[in-house]
């Protein structure tokens, strides 16, 4: 059985110049509405996440909370490596532990930032990041991961969509 991994970029956030610290930027009203619409579409298509990991930045945490609020998953944890410039290898190590401890769970969501999520997808599929995959705000990348072994360069891309195709 493969593991389904969904990489979800945070929704539209407040302007940088309005916040002294980029980490503190929340979703805008439009970002919240659009993200909620995307989340409901994913839910209505039968998706459910066994575990949601999110960047600790406010806009990503708010996006992950929306996923949880619409019923896409119950288990939600912050994961520091999903912050900008985070290390995929830290997540790969987490994944190995998760695989060993799970009970038939096979669907994960990671909420983070661009270009990081696009780069992570490239690393998982092709084994190298070239910043070619662009993920729009509230966009989704879907990957199939092998059941065992390091997923880098061994995963399959099955979805890359912007929110406009989901709402």
State where each predicted segment sits:
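Short phosphate-binding loop-to-helix
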Residues: 83-100
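Hydrophobic packing residues within well-ordered alpha-helices of enzyme cores
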Residues: 63-67, 91, 120-121
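Glycine-rich phosphate-binding loop signature in dinucleotide/nucleotide-binding domains
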Residues: 45-47, 98-106
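Active-site-proximal alpha-helix that buttresses catalytic centers in soluble enzyme cores
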Residues: 2-82, 86, 131, 135-137
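Domain-level recognition of soluble alpha/beta enzyme cores
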Residues: 128-158
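A glycine-rich beta-strand to alpha-helix segment
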Residues: 105-121
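Short, solvent-exposed aromatic-acidic interface loops
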Residues: 156-167
């Amino acid at each position: 059985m493969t593991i389904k991994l969904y990489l979800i970029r945070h929704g539209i956030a407040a302007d940088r110049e309005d916040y002294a610290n980029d980490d503190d930027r929340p979703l805008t009203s439009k970002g919240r509405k659009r993200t909620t619409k995307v989340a409901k579409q994913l839910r209505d298509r039968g998706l459910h996440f066994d575990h949601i990991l999110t960047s600790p930045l406010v806009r990503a945490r708010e996006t992950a909370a929306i996923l949880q609020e619409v019923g896409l998953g119950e288990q939600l944890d912050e994961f520091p490596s999903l912050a900008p410039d985070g290390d995929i290898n830290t997540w790969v190590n987490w994944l190995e532990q998760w695989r060993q401890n799970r009970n038939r769970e096979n669907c994960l969501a990671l909420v983070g930032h661009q270009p990081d999520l696009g780069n992570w997808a490239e690393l998982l599929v092709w084994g190298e990041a070239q910043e070619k995959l662009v993920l729009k705000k509230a966009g989704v990348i879907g990957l199939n991961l092998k059941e065992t072994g390091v997923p880098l360069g061994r995963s399959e891309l099955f979805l890359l969509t912007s929110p406009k195709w989901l709402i």
